[in-house]
C-alpha cells in the first residue's frame, strides 16, 4: 500500500489517479496508523514553503513520517513543494524543512530572458543511474510550475537536472528519499513511467 500524505496541501486526487493507472494500491490518509503500515509514502504539495511546513506540523505527522522514512527507511517521494520540504530550508520563508536531505531551496533570479515562475513543459537530463529513472531519458518532458528550486549540498544527490536559462536541479535522491520538482501527476506518459518505477522499487 502506498499512502499519499493528506495534510490539506497538494494535488492528491491527481496523484491517486496516476497511481491507480499504474496498478498501485494507494490511498490518501492523515492517519498515523496508515503511515506506519504503508510500504511507501508520497508527500505532495503546492504553494508557499512556510505554509506547507506549518500545515504539516499542525497535522502532527512530522514525527511519525520522520520515523518511517529515516529509521524504518521507507521509500518516500516528494512532489513539487513536497520535494523542497525534504530539505533544510527555503529562501521563501523562515520555517525549517524536514531535513531528510541536506539541501536548501532558492529562488530563480528575474531576468529579461525568462519569466518567473518557470511554468510549462521542459526536458530533463538524468545525472545518476537509478531504477527510479527506468525509461526516463534526455527526451523525457515533465510539467513544471515553480519559482524556487532545490540546491543539494552534495552533487551526488542530484537525480535529474533541467535548463531554464541556467542549469538547475529537477530531482534529488538520497537512499530511500526522492524529490521531484516537477508535477509527475500532470506529466502524462513520462509521469506515469516515474510513478510505475516508484511503485516497483524494492
Swiss-Prot record:
CDD domains listed in its UniProt record: GATase1_IGP_Synthase (cd01748)
Active site per UniProt: 80 (nucleophile), 183, 185
GO molecular function: glutaminase activity; imidazoleglycerol-phosphate synthase activity; lyase activity
GO cellular component: cytoplasm
PROSITE patterns found in the cross-reference section: GATASE_TYPE_1
Record localization: Cytoplasm
Reactions listed under catalytic activity: 5-[(5-phospho-1-deoxy-D-ribulos-1-ylimino)methylamino]-1-(5-phospho-beta-D-ribosyl)imidazole-4-carboxamide + L-glutamine = D-erythro-1-(imidazol-4-yl)glycerol 3-phosphate + 5-amino-1-(5-phospho-beta-D-ribosyl)imidazole-4-carboxamide + L-glutamate + H(+); L-glutamine + H2O = L-glutamate + NH4(+)
Any single biological process term in GO: O antigen biosynthetic process
Protein EC: 4.3.2.10, 3.5.1.2
Residue intervals of the Glutamine amidotransferase type-1 domain: 1-202
InterPro entries in alphabetical order: Class_I_gatase-like, GATASE, Imidazole-glycPsynth_HisH
Predominant cellular place of this UniProt entry's protein: cytoplasm
A Pfam family this chain is assigned to: GATase
Superkingdom classification of source: Bacteria
Metabolic or biological pathway: Amino-acid biosynthesis; L-histidine biosynthesis; L-histidine from 5-phospho-alpha-D-ribose 1-diphosphate: step 5/9
Keywords, comma-separated and alphabetical: Amino-acid biosynthesis, Cytoplasm, Glutamine amidotransferase, Histidine biosynthesis, Hydrolase, Lyase
UniProt subunit comment: Heterodimer of HisH and HisF.
Functional note: IGPS catalyzes the conversion of PRFAR and glutamine to IGP, AICAR and glutamate. The HisH subunit catalyzes the hydrolysis of glutamine to glutamate and ammonia as part of the synthesis of IGP and AICAR. The resulting ammonia molecule is channeled to the active site of HisF.
PANTHER family: IMIDAZOLE GLYCEROL PHOSPHATE SYNTHASE SUBUNIT HISH
Annotated HAMAP family: HisH
The name this protein goes by in its record: Imidazole glycerol phosphate synthase subunit HisH 2
Organism encoding this protein: Pseudomonas aeruginosa (strain ATCC 15692 / DSM 22644 / CIP 104116 / JCM 14847 / LMG 12228 / 1C / PRS 101 / PAO1)
Amino acid at each position: 500500500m502506498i499512502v499519499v500524505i493528506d495534510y490539506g496541501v497538494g494535488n492528491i486526487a491527481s496523484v491517486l489517479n496516476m497511481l491507480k493507472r499504474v496498478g498501485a494500491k494507494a490511498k490518501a490518509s492523515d492517519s498515523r496508523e496508515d503511515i506506519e503500515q504503508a510500504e511507501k509514502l508520497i508527500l505532495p504539495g503546492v504553494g508557499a514553503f512556510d505554509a506547507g511546513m506549518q500545515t504539516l506540523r499542525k497535522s502532527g505527522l512530522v514525527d511519525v513520517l520522520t520515523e518511517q522514512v529515516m529509521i524504518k527507511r521507507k521509500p518516500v517521494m516528494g512532489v513539487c513543494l513536497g520535494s523542497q520540504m525534504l530539505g533544510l530550508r527555503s529562501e521563501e520563508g523562515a520555517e525549517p524543512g524536514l531535513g531528510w536531505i541536506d539541501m536548501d531551496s532558492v529562488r530563480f533570479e528575474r531576468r529579461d530572458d525568462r519569466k518567473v515562475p518557470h511554468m510549462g513543459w521542459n526536458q530533463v537530463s538524468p545525472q545518476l543511474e537509478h531504477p527510479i529513472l527506468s525509461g526516463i531519458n534526455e527526451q523525457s518532458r515533465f510539467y513544471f510550475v515553480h519559482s524556487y528550486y532545490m540546491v543539494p549540498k552534495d552533487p551526488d544527490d542530484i537525480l535529474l537536472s533541467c535548463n531554464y536559462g541556467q542549469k538547475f536541479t529537477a530531482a534529488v535522491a538520497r537512499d530511500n528519499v526522492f524529490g521531484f520538482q516537477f508535477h509527475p501527476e500532470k506529466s502524462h506518459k513520462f509521469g506515469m513511467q516515474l510513478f510505475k518505477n516508484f511503485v516497483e522499487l524494492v
